UniProtKB/Swiss-Prot annotation:
It is found in: Cell inner membrane. The lineage of its organism: Bacteria, Pseudomonadati, Spirochaetota, Spirochaetia, Spirochaetales. It is a multi-pass membrane protein. This is Protein translocase subunit SecF. The keyword Iron does not apply. One of its GO terms (biological process) is intracellular protein transmembrane transport.
C-alpha cells in the first residue's frame, strides 16, 4: 500500500508563508510602486514600415494638389480655394510599372516624378505613408516592396530603438507586409544625444544627460533613431496616435475586471460541479496564484503589461485544471471511505494525484523554460511569469485549496462534509 504523505501538517505554515510573501509584495508596491508597461501608460503609438523609395513626387504649381493611393490606383486632384479642378486617375491595370506611370504622369502640369527604383517595379507593390496628402515643392516619397528587397525584422528594429527608453516594438498585420508598431511612454527621460535637432539647435542642452521630454518630442526621438539607421527616405510613417492617461487608466480597470470575471465564472463552475466550499477553496487558491505572480513582478522589477495579464489568465486556467482533478479524487475518496476525516481524505487524494501533478508540471515547465532561454524582451518576461505561476499553482492546489477546505470542515468527516 502506498504511503500517504501528510500534506495537512503544513497547511497552517504554508498559509503563513503565503501571507508573508504576498504582504511583502504589497509593501514594496506601496513604497516603490510597480513598473507598468506602455499598455497601461499614456504615450505614443506609431505604425510604420521600413522600405526603399520607388519614386518621389514634386508639385510646383500655384494651385493645391492632393495625392491619393490605394491598392488599385493613384489619383491626383488639382483644386483652388472654393473650386474643384481637374482629377487625374492612374489605374494599375493601365499603368502596371513605374515606367508606365512616370510616362503617363507627364500629362499632369507642374508635377514631376523621379524614379528611385528599377522601371520594371510593379505599381501594385508600391505604397505611400498615408492614404492622402498634399503635394508641394518638397519631395513626397512613395515606397515599394518586392522579392529582391531586404526587409528588416522586428528584432532588428528593436536593436535600432534599444537606446530609446521604454520603446516597445511589435510586428502587426500580415508578416509579408512588414508593418511594425512602436510604443513609447509619454513621460520618458531621453538622453540628449537621442533628441533631433531643429534649426541647428538641439532640443536639449548637451550638458543635460537626461530630461523628460514634452509629448510631441517622443515622436521626434523615435523618428530620429529610425532615420539614423535607415535614412529619411526609407522610413514610412503610416499612422500615429497618442494614448492619454485617462484611457490608460481605463485599460487597467478593464484588465482587473477581466480577471475578476474569470474568477466569478470559475467559482460558479466549481460550485455547480462540486459544492460551494470546494469552489471557495479553488478561488482562494487562484487569487493566491495571481497575487504571488504580481508580487514576483514587483520584487524583480518586471514590467506589468498585457502579456502579464495573459500570463495570469493562463495560470488561472492551468491551476484550476489541477485543482478540479484533485477535488474529483477527493470526492471519490469520500464515497469510498465516508468515515475518514477531511484532512485524511485530502492527504490520501493529494498523494494519489502527486505523480500526475509532478509529471504535468515538469513537462509544462520545460516548455516555458525553452521559451525563456531562446527568446528575449517581453516573451522572456512572459515565460518567467508562467514558470512562477506554475510552481505557485501546484503549491496552492495542495496547501491553499486543501487548507481552505480543511478549515471550513474542522472536526467533520468526509461523509458529513458531503451530507452522506
Amino acid at each position: 500500500m502506498r504511503q500517504v504523505v501528510r500534506f495537512s501538517l503544513l497547511f497552517l505554515p504554508c498559509a503563513i508563508l503565503s501571507v508573508v510573501l504576498i504582504g511583502a509584495g504589497v509593501l514594496r508596491w506601496a513604497l516603490w510602486g510597480m513598473s507598468f508597461g506602455i499598455d497601461f501608460q499614456s504615450g505614443l503609438i506609431e505604425r510604420l514600415r521600413i522600405a526603399p523609395p520607388a519614386f518621389s513626387l514634386v508639385y510646383t504649381g500655384t494651385q493645391s494638389m492632393q495625392f491619393f493611393q490605394d491598392e488599385q490606383k493613384v489619383v491626383f486632384t488639382v483644386s483652388s480655394p472654393g473650386v474643384l479642378g481637374e482629377r487625374y486617375e492612374f489605374l494599375y491595370t493601365e499603368y502596371p510599372t513605374l515606367r508606365a506611370f512616370s510616362e503617363g504622369a507627364k500629362k499632369v502640369e507642374h508635377l514631376s516624378v523621379t524614379l528611385h527604383a528599377p522601371e520594371t517595379v510593379y505599381m501594385r507593390d508600391t505604397f505611400s505613408g498615408a492614404e492622402g496628402s498634399t503635394l508641394s515643392s518638397a519631395s513626397c516619397f512613395v515606397h515599394y516592396f518586392s522579392e529582391d528587397v531586404r526587409a528588416p525584422g522586428v528584432e532588428e528594429l528593436r536593436r535600432v530603438l534599444k537606446d530609446v527608453p521604454s520603446a516597445v516594438v511589435q510586428q502587426v498585420g500580415v508578416r509579408a507586409e512588414h508593418t511594425f508598431q512602436v510604443r513609447v511612454a509619454a513621460e520618458t527621460a531621453f538622453p540628449s544625444s537621442l533628441l533631433p535637432e531643429q534649426g541647428g539647435t538641439a532640443l536639449a542642452q548637451s550638458d543635460a544627460p537626461d530630461l523628460v521630454t514634452p509629448q510631441g518630442a517622443v515622436e521626434s526621438v523615435v523618428y530620429a533613431a529610425l532615420v539614423r539607421a535607415y535614412g529619411a527616405d526609407h522610413v514610412v510613417r503610416l499612422a500615429m496616435d497618442f494614448v492619454g492617461s485617462r484611457f490608460s487608466h481605463l485599460l487597467v480597470r478593464q484588465a482587473l475586471l477581466l480577471v475578476l470575471g474569470a474568477l466569478v465564472l470559475i467559482f460558479l463552475y466549481v460550485a455547480l460541479r462540486f459544492r460551494w466550499f470546494f469552489a471557495l477553496g479553488a478561488i482562494v487558491a487562484l487569487v493566491h496564484d495571481a497575487c504571488i505572480m504580481v508580487s514576483f513582478m514587483v520584487w524583480f522589477g518586471l514590467e506589468f503589461n498585457s502579456a502579464s495579464i495573459a500570463a495570469i489568465l493562463t495560470i488561472i486556467g492551468y491551476s484550476i485544471n489541477d485543482t478540479v482533478v484533485v477535488f474529483d479524487r477527493v470526492r471519490q475518496t469520500i464515497l469510498l471511505d465516508p468515515i475518514a476525516s477531511v484532512t485524511t481524505v485530502l492527504d490520501r487524494s493529494q498523494t494519489d494525484m502527486l505523480t500526475r501533478t509532478v509529471v504535468t508540471t515538469v513537462t509544462t515547465l520545460l516548455a516555458a523554460l525553452m521559451l525563456y532561454v531562446f527568446t528575449e524582451g517581453g516573451s522572456r518576461d512572459f515565460s518567467l511569469a508562467l514558470m512562477v505561476g506554475m510552481v505557485s499553482g501546484v503549491y496552492s492546489t495542495i496547501y491553499i485549496a486543501g487548507g481552505c477546505i480543511a478549515l471550513i470542515s474542522r472536526g467533520k468527516s468526509g461523509g458529513q462534509l458531503l451530507g452522506l
